């Protein structure tokens, strides 16, 4: 056992590594200031009758959009969030390590979705936790800030007409814009052997991106062990080439070692804005439409506090922006009459727009892990050794309590599979047979979209340097098997299996049917099997092997392909990254939104969340969702910049002639009638392009 671990085991963890940083103060976590920072949140349910923008979902993307769009004081913004504020459980949100030991999963702050039984995963129903609180899943997740690769982002941009807006240069700038990066403390960097490049980061954004204030010594063995089995260290994992081994940045505020999430980053530091209202405990029940020039137009949004409660309606002057996530956004579209015709009719919903792709192309990262006993202290064993009673845990963070798992590697197909070129060709050749048997839709458009995603994955991604398997070191899993354990996880990054979600009721409070079709394509089973073999090999490689004792799961008896496949079908789980259910694809390929994020057939409804990604990235989705939301805000503002400028001029003129006549922003309408947004040209137009260029500032 390492001496440092022996020492720490005998010391109260509140006093461990009590570094003073004083960097990047976050007023949200100054509890004396918190009351001042609640002023954009509506606690009594009183809102105006209409808003320019109604954002559905106050999660990761929704609060970014609310903050950015309300920067224009002549624009009114409302956020409707189904969950509560989270203030009653703030310590469980704020303290990073509580995501493992004292989390909100399974509480009223978790949507607690569940898949239907998965035939290729031992007929199990698999839990899908999602954050039901201001901040959404950014308030309960593992805080990884891992970006996709340049190749993946450019591949996304290539799938849709005029998709160059979403190319790497633009998304890279948007992800940098979202963050304030702080390098690791010197002792943390030395312990973990962290490599990074300042040039890949932003230093003035709302979200804090940093590292824990304390580092477990086993993390320092991570990259050397991977190097010893021919996986290189990534010197700049956030710069577009994020394959190889590294220690990931995390959404941690190093001023006080707390979680940085969309609420604490984008909303609470704001001064009071009369043009911004955030209404918690407001579940959107449907979007209200009317026929107008330019297509079906959203005129309002209905919402209720809970099932059976009286519904209220708020009018929309400009746009409805769905940011309810990969489950919520397609469900809201479907109960509003936008989706596959057969699904809507079966659920008793009047069809407004028959759009077959809504809820289709659903993808997720699936993971399993190999676990060993260890004679060394782990973060989990240290925590439970000091806090056996969770009623006595601290309510403020410390450097040790900021420790979360962050040792990562992205391993490509060629490092996992024997004869990779041959097997990749077999996968590519199977596109038609896979499409004819595995697509859960009767619509030809959805089948064509499946083929497009399949071909891109097989031909552009599979044999590239991009990691097809994420490998993670877990030092927080004490209690599941033994008091002291270490796990190495493998998570499939580019699944060939695609599923769907759909409604079977017109009632938004009835959960949709979620069917990711895990492991339905045999290639996924083979790759995850080989990923687990890689985990076992890594755990038996020095210097990491010094920490490993007996392998207890799956155990040494699991050796053959068949044994591995049987075991992983019984022991694989979501990595909490559902996406692609409102895919940005051509409508002819089952797409739901165009390159401007606008829903096909609707004049003024957009989707801006992880559901629009057309395929899974080799990354955690938090960083690209922040980038997506930053870019979406610029895109939306660019759409209306001329109209808003005219309104501002008109308002200034009226103000100068009658200075005592004031109108509250909450009741202001920017136009007497609903505005139909102009469609941006292929190049987005000079005005919108200029607005997007501001992302780089």
Predicted regions span which residues?
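N-terminal redox-cofactor-binding region of secreted/periplasmic oxidoreductases
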Residues: 2-8, 12-665, 680-696
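Polybasic, lysine/arginine-rich low-complexity segments
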Residues: 668-669
């Amino acid at each position: 056992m390492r001496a440092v671990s022996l020492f720490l085991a005998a010391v109260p963890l509140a006093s461990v590594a009590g570094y003073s940083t004083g960097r990047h103060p976050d007023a949200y976590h100054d509890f004396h200031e918190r009351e001042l920072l609640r002023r954009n949140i509506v606690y009594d349910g009183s809102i105006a009758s209409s808003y320019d923008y109604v954002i559905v979902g106050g999660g990761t993307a929704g609060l970014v959009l609310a903050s950015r769009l309300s920067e224009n004081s002549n624009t009114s913004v409302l956020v409707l969030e189904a969950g509560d504020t989270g203030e009653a459980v703030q310590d469980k949100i704020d303290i990073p390590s509580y995501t493992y030991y004292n989390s909100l999963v399974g509480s009223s702050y978790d949507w607690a979705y569940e898949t239907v039984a998965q035939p290729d995963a031992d007929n199990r129903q698999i839990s899908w936790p999602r954050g039901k609180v201001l901040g959404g899943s950014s308030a309960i997740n593992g805080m990884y800030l891992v970006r996709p690769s340049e190749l993946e982002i450019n591949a996304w941009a290539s799938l849709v007409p005029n998709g160059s807006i979403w190319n790497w240069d633009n998304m890279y700038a948007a992800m940098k814009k979202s963050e304030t990066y702080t390098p690791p403390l010197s002792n943390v960097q030395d312990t973990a052997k962290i490599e990074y490049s300042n040039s890949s980061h932003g230093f003035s954004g709302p979200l804090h991106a940093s590292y824990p204030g304390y580092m477990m010594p086993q993390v320092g063995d991570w990259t050397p062990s991977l190097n010893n089995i021919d996986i290189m260290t990534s010197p700049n994992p956030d710069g577009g080439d994020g394959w190889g081994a590294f220690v990931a940045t995390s959404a941690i505020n190093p001023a006080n070692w707390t979680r940085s999430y969309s609420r604490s980053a984008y909303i609470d530091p704001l001064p009071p804005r009369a043009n911004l209202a955030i209404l918690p405990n407001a579940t959107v029940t449907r979007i209200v439409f009317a026929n107008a020039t330019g297509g079906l137009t959203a005129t309002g949004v209905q919402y209720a506090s809970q099932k059976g409660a009286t519904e209220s309606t708020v009018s929309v002057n400009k746009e409805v922006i769905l940011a309810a996530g990969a489950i919520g956004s397609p469900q809201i579209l479907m109960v509003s009459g936008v989706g596959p015709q057969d699904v809507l009719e079966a659920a008793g919903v009047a069809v407004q727009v028959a759009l077959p792709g809504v809820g289709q192309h659903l993808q997720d990262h699936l993971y399993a892990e190999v676990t060993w006993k260890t004679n060394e202290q782990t973060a989990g064993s240290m925590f439970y050794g000091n806090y056996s009673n969770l009623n006595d845990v601290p309510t403020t963070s410390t450097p040790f309590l900021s420790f979360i798992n962050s040792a990562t590697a992205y391993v490509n197909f060629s490092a996992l599979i024997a004869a990779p070129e041959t097997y990749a060709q077999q996968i590519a050749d199977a596109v038609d047979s896979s499409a004819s048997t595995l697509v859960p839709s009767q619509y030809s458009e959805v089948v064509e979209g499946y083929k497009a995603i399949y071909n891109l994955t097989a031909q552009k991604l599979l044999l590239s340097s991009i990691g097809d398997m994420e490998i993670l070191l877990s030092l927080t899993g004490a209690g599941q098997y033994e008091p002291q354990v270490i796990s190495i996880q493998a998570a499939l990054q580019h699944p060939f299996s695609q599923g769907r979600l759909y409604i079977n009721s017109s009632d938004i409070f009835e959960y949709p049917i979620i069917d990711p079709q895990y492991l339905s394509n045999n290639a996924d089973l083979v790759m995850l099997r080989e990923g687990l073999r890689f985990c076992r090999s890594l755990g038996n490689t020095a210097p990491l092997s010094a920490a490993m004792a007996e392998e207890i799961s799956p155990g040494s008896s699991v050796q053959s392909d068949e044994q591995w496949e049987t075991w992983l079908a019984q022991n694989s789980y979501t990595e909490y990254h559902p996406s692609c259910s409102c895919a940005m694809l051509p409508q002819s390929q089952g797409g739901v939104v165009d390159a401007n994020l606008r829903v096909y057939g609707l004049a003024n409804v957009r989707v801006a969340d992880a559901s629009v990604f057309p395929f899974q990235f080799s990354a955690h989705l938090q960083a690209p969702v922040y980038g997506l939301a930053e870019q979406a805000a610029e895109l939306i503002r660019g759409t209306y910049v001329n109209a808003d400028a005219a309104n501002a001029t008109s308002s200034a003129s009226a103000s100068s002639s009658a200075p005592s006549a004031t109108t509250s922003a909450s009741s202001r309408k920017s136009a007497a009638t609903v505005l139909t947004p102009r469609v941006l040209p292929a190049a987005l137009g000079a005005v919108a392009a200029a607005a997007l260029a501001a992302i780089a500032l």
